[in-house]
Amino acid sequence: PGYNWPQIKVDLKHGVDPEVDTTFKMTSDEFFEKHISQKYDFIFVDGLHVFEQCYRDIVNSLNHLNDNGTIMAHDTNPSSEIAQRPVRESDSWNGDVWKAILKLRLENENLEIVTVDTDEGCSLMRRGKQKLLNPKADVNSEDLYNYEVFQHNRRKILNMISVSEFKEKFLS
């Protein structure tokens, strides 16, 4: 859990990690399978840094989210092509989790999704409504999962907001 864990002051907090000694030393898939009825106000997704697992964690998190809850996925705004590769090849590494946000922006109109332009991208999701991305109209491409297309359209794809916009929208 690292530095931030002790600073989180809530009645219920769980950490899930198969490698780190935390509340639940298991994979997120195992956790979601075994703890079906547990609900949370806030779920932080920062796991394997690969698209498929991040997407699965977000979908599973939705089933464990209280009605007014929020999910945050970390590392969704990679700074370079090498940083977004699914296998770590450099010091800076996000993996391709940005694709999970893209998929949700393309397919799930019942989520409100924004990405705060901070700390390699923090994407916030909560139940609500969003206008789905239209590949041809919004980014003029069918190949949205290509990094170069993402690079040129990241603000639109991630629905990027600034830290001050985040504070105004979520903290006021």
Sequence positions of predicted segments:
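SAM cofactor-binding core of SAM-dependent methyltransferases
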Residues: 1-35, 40-42, 77-80, 85
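C-terminal substrate-binding/active-site "lid" region of AdoMet-derived donor-dependent transferases
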Residues: 53-172
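Switch II (G3) loop of P-loop NTPases
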Residues: 46-49
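Structural motif
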Residues: 42-44, 72
